[in-house]
């Protein structure tokens, strides 16, 4: 394999490409910097917000800040982002200590812009979902806003050291949100979360330092500078493996997933929405940004492993979800299963499958947030998460049943919903990916289809157990009021893009198509340079 050849140079050139329309660095409005710093600065000002004592003032303040942040990201997309440009846009670079490679560097392309919009959108709805929070509301919304800025920074920064800092910044709010407002086992879930994610994220720091100080030249943590370094095959493989572990925990990849069911099992509804809607997408984004883009030669070697791990995710998590009797854990394992399609798409050398993986992240962000919000709303009424203690509540909660049905159908990839389009793109894209042998493609698509079959079984049976049959005696005295306007509004806001993407996916896919095609094309020269191909890879494939 030609490690120091044209593939790596091409990757560096493409990562650093700034089209003429994108070179409006410091003379245009700093959209991304504002979107990052506004919620963080606003969170610090929460102690100054006047409040009568019931948290109402803080709630409106946090909602206003998150909505403003969302409008800023929309403004960035409409005024400074061109989806036909594959390179970085909305750039802002401010050197700080150039000799140490330290500075502020942000930008957006097709990999990051859709996820920045998703982050600000879900966070706004999470603030609305947190309206019933009365215990320490100032601290709760402080953490929620700080998390918003940190997550946007993960997708926007173009410096690996800044990426590590942003990655770590969002860990602290999640830990505290779990440890303070979680369920009975909140301390265990929060500790497990921080141990898994903090320890694994050390690999990000080690890789960043190793790459910045290797290969000669000035010290820099800029993505484009790191990609331009001439790295040996062994060094590339070590960096790739380390980052795969770090990002695999966040995605999560089986067997690095065990923190997620515990975290979801104890979290409140708004924290659920942020975990499922945004946090998991950070892992998929990072695999695209670093593993697939920065190490094209190593990615060729690891891609079959990603595909196999994706199938394991789909089948194992679907079977485990089928066996769960706890409602939160059932949906949590369903999330792990759906993220398996992201792994298959990233491991594929087909632009269609890779585009499907990107769409799956966006789709699952919306669907996962909606399902977990409904789980929280249902628990507030029934005060139980055990399916054995539910049943027959459909007569008293018809609006809630309608919302559950719509979101469950979206999760099982009903045609006309976003999940159907994204999973179909991954299936068809991988089936037509000439980089892999035909038997391997048949086995992978066939195995993944098992998960697709299991999903409607466990989701529809879940609906039956919650809403149909005889009402359980335990619920006879429960305050089973139907969905209130706030809850209907939140679910409607999530269902509109779910259905819109399902009916016309180009609304979203066009926003990242050029960048995804560029990422996949980077691996073509690496594949052609693979002088000793191994099954299931072919030599010099014709990319679909």
UniProtKB/Swiss-Prot annotation:
InterPro entries: NADH_Q_OxRdtase_chain4 (IPR022997), NADH_Q_OxRdtase_chainM/4 (IPR010227), NADH_UbQ_OxRdtase (IPR003918), ND/Mrp_TM (IPR001750). It catalyses: a plastoquinone + NADH + (n+1) H(+)(in) = a plastoquinol + NAD(+) + n H(+)(out); a plastoquinone + NADPH + (n+1) H(+)(in) = a plastoquinol + NADP(+) + n H(+)(out). Its EC number is 7.1.1.-. GO terms for molecular function: NADH dehydrogenase (ubiquinone) activity; ubiquinone binding. Pfam families: Proton_antipo_M. It is an enzyme of class 7 (translocase). It is found in: Cellular thylakoid membrane. One of its GO terms (cellular component) is plasma membrane-derived thylakoid membrane. The keyword Thylakoid applies. The keyword Protease does not apply. It is a multi-pass membrane protein. Its main location: membrane. GO terms for biological process: ATP synthesis coupled electron transport; electron transport coupled proton transport. Belongs to the complex I subunit 4 family. PANTHER family: NAD(P)H-QUINONE OXIDOREDUCTASE CHAIN 4, CHLOROPLASTIC, NADH-UBIQUINONE OXIDOREDUCTASE CHAIN 4. NDH-1 shuttles electrons from NAD(P)H, via FMN and iron-sulfur (Fe-S) centers, to quinones in the respiratory chain. The immediate electron acceptor for the enzyme in this species is believed to be plastoquinone. Couples the redox reaction to proton translocation (for every two electrons transferred, four hydrogen ions are translocated across the cytoplasmic membrane), and thus conserves the redox energy in a proton gradient. NCBIfam families: NDH_I_M (TIGR01972), PRK02546.1 (NF002713), PRK12561.1 (NF009212). This is NAD(P)H-quinone oxidoreductase chain 4.
